[in-house]
Each structure stands twice: as structure tokens, then as C-alpha cells.
Design a protein with these regions (language model features):
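A motif-centric signal for short, conserved binding hotspots located
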Residues: 1-225
Length: 225
């Protein structure tokens, strides 16, 4: 019988788009302490790759605000990597520093994602259908989602760095200072489902009603003017 009060995570893996937790087996090694088992030909996603069953606690991250990219208690005990870049836009990180999540005040959710979704895992050759998030979140790019830091800290951006007030919706109104987590956009398409990047009916594991990218519902590219 199901454990009383437990989240039905398994149901999310029946959705069209999901991490390959049930479809790739026999690849994970315990323990995985670095990138040697994360690259092309070794791609996998076990529960343990994101959660430490001995240290995880109840509680997801707080959405929006200046601490919107901090991990939630569900990620305690896991590890990720912090990228370091040079001064050139649109290139991947030059190095990565391992981060072990011992608290919820000094570690960021993107660090967990970067350990598999960046050149840390696959060097200069991303797997088919995967992009290097260390390139896309490079602080010297002209723009980026405020995953690593608030937009006022996007070094390569020009003034005004944040979007205009008319271009954002709640809770993303603290323009320039607030940060966000990967799972703020990549989550189940059903709001009542358990939180996290487990599975979605929308491509690229997107959540909510704004599931159109790079075009809007009419098939037209977005215009921020």
C-alpha cells in the first residue's frame, strides 16, 4: 500500500516529457562524486542524482525574491557545481567547483542542474537535444534569466538591465534584484502535482500556461518591445 501522505512521484514519469528515471537503468554508480559517470553515453537520472535519501527534508525553495535561486530542503545532502567564467560572452565555463549542499542559505538550485546540464558533464559535446546551460547563463552574455544572479548583476548587459515593469508578471516584479530557480519554469504542467522537474506534458519539462517557446501561442516570436 502507498505510504500515507507520500507524494505520487511515479505518476509524473508517465507524462510525455521527463527525466529518464524509469527508462535508463544500470548506469548509475554509487557513489557518484564527480563527472566521470555523467557524460555522453552515460546519461541517466536516478532519484539519488538529485536527492539524498538520508539527509533530504520536507520543503521546496521559496519562489522569487533575492533568494529565489537557493535550494529547498528536499535537496539537502546532494551536490552540484559552481561554474567560473572568463570575460567572454557566450562560451562555457572555464572551471567548476563542487558544492555539497549542507544548508539552504549558501547553495543554489542551478548548481545541481549544472552538474548534468553543462560542459562539466559532457565537455564540449552536448548530447542530442541538450544545451550547455553554462553557456546560456554566462554572466557576460547580453542577457540571461536571473538564475545565477539578479539582472542588475548581469555583467554583459547594458542599461537598463532588467525588463520593464510592463514586461513582467507577479511574482517576478522585483526587477533587477530577484532571482529564480530552474524549477520555476521546468516542472509539471499540473499545478497540483508534486513539485520538481520530474515530468510534464509540455515539451522541455515546462509548467503552467506559458508553454510556448520560442514562439507564442500564435506561432510568432515573442516581442519584448
Amino acid at each position: 500500500p502507498a505510504l500515507s501522505g507520500a507524494k505520487n512521484i511515479k505518476s509524473l514519469y508517465a507524462k510525455a516529457y521527463k527525466h529518464p528515471t524509469e527508462t535508463v537503468t544500470g548506469v548509475h554508480k554509487d557513489p557518484e562524486q564527480d563527472a566521470t559517470n555523467l557524460g555522453v553515453g552515460k546519461r541517466h537520472s536516478e532519484c539519488w542524482d538529485c536527492h539524498n535519501p538520508h539527509q533530504a527534508q520536507t520543503g521546496s525553495h521559496t519562489v522569487a525574491g533575492t533568494g529565489g535561486n537557493l535550494i529547498g530542503k528536499v535537496l539537502l545532502g546532494q551536490w552540484g557545481v559552481e561554474p567560473s567564467w572568463g570575460t567572454t560572452a557566450w562560451v562555457t565555463a572555464s572551471s567548476y567547483l563542487k558544492q555539497v549542499f549542507t544548508n539552504t542559505t549558501g547553495f543554489k538550485q542551478y548548481q545541481l542542474c549544472m552538474k548534468c546540464h553543462s560542459s562539466y558533464a559532457f565537455a564540449s559535446t552536448p548530447p542530442t537535444g541538450i544545451t550547455d546551460q553554462a553557456i546560456e547563463l554566462n554572466p557576460y552574455n547580453r542577457g540571461a534569466h536571473p538564475v545565477r544572479a539578479g539582472l542588475n548583476s548581469q555583467t554583459g548587459s547594458t542599461t537598463p538591465k532588467p525588463l520593464a515593469a510592463t514586461q513582467v508578471s507577479a511574482p517576478w516584479t522585483a526587477r533587477g534584484t530577484q532571482t529564480m530557480s530552474c524549477s520555476d519554469c521546468h516542472d509539471s504542467d499540473v499545478a497540483s502535482d508534486p513539485k520538481g522537474t520530474h515530468g510534464s506534458a509540455a515539451a522541455r519539462l515546462k509548467k503552467g500556461t506559458g508553454i510556448y517557446w520560442p514562439t507564442n501561442a500564435s506561432g510568432v516570436l515573442y516581442n519584448l518591445g
